Amino acid sequence: MIALRPTPRAATACALALLLLLQAWSLWRAPDAWFPARITVSLDAGGSVALGRHELAAAQADHNHIALRRDGAGAWWLRNLSAAKQVVLHSAAGERRMGSASLAARQAFQIGAARFEVEDADAASVGFARDGHHWRYDGAVLYRDGQAQAPCADARLGARALALWNRALPAILTIGRPLTFGGNVHCANRLGLADVTPGAAWLARIDGRLQLAAGNPDGERAALTLSAHGLDTDLRRQELPLDGVQAIVVGHTRFQLGAADGQLQLLPSRRVTLFSAPGLQLPPSLTWQWQRRALWSGAAATPLWCALALALAALLAATLRPQPPARSWRADALACAAVLLGGVAALALQRAGHAPAAAQSMALAGAALWLWLALPGRLTLAGAAAVLLLAAGLLAQLELGLGGMETSWLRYYQKSAALLAIGAGLGGAWRLCGPRRTGVPSQRGVEAVLAALAALALLALAMQVLWGDETGVFDLQPVELAKLALTALSAHCLALRLGWHGDDHHRDSRAARWLRLIAPALLFLALLGVALVQVDDYSPLILLLVWGTAMAFAYALAARNRALAAALALLVLLAAGAIAGMHGGADPGEAAPAGDFYADRFQAWLAPALHPHTGQQLLLGARAIGDGGWWGADAKLGLAGLGQGAGAALLIPAVQDDFAPAFFLNRHGLVGALLLWALQAAFIVGLLRTALRGHAAGAAARDHRHAWLGRFRYFTLCGGAAFVLGHLLLSWGTNLAILPIMGQPMSFLSAGGSHLLFFLCPLLAFSAASALSLEENPSCRSTSSTKS
């Protein structure tokens, strides 16, 4: 057995064990919580009942959200009573939103006093007429009398470019944009109507069909009527039969439906309100079947516990056996495989609606973190800091999940644990395979891998532009994969650039070579920027600016270009001074023109108290941070509040993502934040230390392949550290009101699943593999006789 010595690995293991014990203590102290596993509605023929947030245990529903009615024949009917929130019906035919309808020829629809006659309609487009004008909409572009409308005056460059794209390309390649009714201006995809609030109704392609739906404008809501076969239907008061409907979604809570013996059964499956005790006053026609929240056992418990037991057994075999000169490879590989399979199983169960218990997720995350410590190689500063940061982030997410009185809060912790296990398993397998490979990978092979990674990232970004929004596509964030590809591709180009010798080529030849080398990175950067502008999210562009500045500074240091380094440092100081000056001396009323989304956000940052609606996030975050003080809301560094309610901090919008630092400061105070800052600084410094070792090894190598590999490691780790530093700066700046709200998660702390799986885990694996290779080959074979 390994003798316990005060080594960095032992100290990290002790700190990790403490953080895992705090997670277990949180689960142990969590009070019992109850929720309705089954809601039964019993109505006589002709009876009806109104249900809402209280009766459905749906926290996001309105007070009176839906009305259920049973007609004389015993059939059940549903009507949406909410003026602002939709109800979605799921059946074998697909998804249908209440308050919407598919248009057909010879129908008519009326918005307020404006009546439109539908001339023709199919899956591709719909044509309608009013007051002698003929309109056609194809899901992307609105045409008036055969001509596309001009862009709106307030349209940004991205919206104008998107409009040109949709007009020029075939329908299959267009990017869907809804048609909105209301307002007094005809432009782009807006159809102006006098005395109708903008956004009173909209027409868009949903599930391959063009559907008309009532909107939720800020002003007065106009009536929306559909006339078909001599009948007029008010879409805002639409009533639909539940025959054939399998599930409904009310206020983000999903209910499986089942009708039998004059009763309607509703089985809530997500975002269900929790109660401290089983017992609630309900209408006579409503009964609940109570169920206790299970934190220690869940769906498919036995197979998942078996996988975790296998992983833990392999980890024990890898760490507690006598230490031989060459470590055993099989036990480590078995541990990686078991952790990977456990993560895949946990993620699949969660996606299927049967999430594992919190204790299973805790054990899975613990196995993944111990795997990083058990794998061969010296534990670096970056690796130790990353393990502790991941454990601290999981503890904060578990506190968030246990502190919220809603079943959905735990899903962030469960998803992060599953993705961490997947990333640790894949990264560990790569680390194990690295020492078994001999030699340096060929440049062509590396370029092929980088090209494939860039193509995959571009494809994912295109999917986000076509089918997603600023939050991602298919519950993933392609931007995270794009950042990884951009970092690796740029590192390769810069590594090749440093390999040139000043007396090898003429000036023109060197300029041409530079252009050819950097062109792929510039092209990818341009495409990434265009894609981000199209999905209406500018904060990643600011993150790219931070990354680009850091990469240029790293190149200046490597090339010993002191003038460039000094210019970049001066630029950073000027930017910091400009931000401080704007925040301290700008007039909130004149800082930016009103009416633009980012202008409103900028004004809310300068004076959130003057904008109580748009500045609510900043105000709630500041209040939570103030309540935390130095030692946390419980005055005991958050230890007394483990497993207990989270209070008003849960009211902060996006508290699990953008404002996770505000929640952490509320729970653990400024002292806890200082410890977190120290770990974050240690991680950045650790990455840079490994990067400098790689650069030194490349500079000492006499073989051009080893020299390129050292420089590639240097720029890749510098780029990764720059992105992480950018995330930390933007997140802390947002939460502390130093910067406007940027919408970027904090690395390791926020519940950013894609950021963890697609960026952090590959970066950690590359850093560990680089450190291991540099440890085994400290000179990078500098005695080789091959000339560069």
Could you tell me what each predicted segment is?
Residues 244, 251, 306-317, 670-726:
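Hydrophobic transmembrane alpha-helices and their immediate junctions
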Residues 407-409, 465-490, 508-517, 538-540, ...:
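Membrane-interface segments at transmembrane-helix junctions in multi-pass inner-membrane proteins
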Residues 2-4, 708-716, 726-788:
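A juxtamembrane structural motif centered on a specific transmembrane helix
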Residues 520-534, 538-590:
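Hydrophobic alpha-helical segments of polytopic membrane proteins
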Residues 44-115, 119-122, 136-137, 141-235, ...:
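Forkhead-associated
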Residues 2-38, 241-468, 524-527, 675, ...:
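A structural signal for hydrophobic alpha-helical transmembrane segments in multi-pass membrane proteins
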Residues 38-40, 564-676, 709-712:
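Hydrophobic, glycine- and aromatic-enriched re-entrant/interface helices and adjoining loop segments
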Residues 327-330, 377-384, 440-446, 511-519, ...:
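Membrane-interfacial entry segments at the cytosolic side of transmembrane helices
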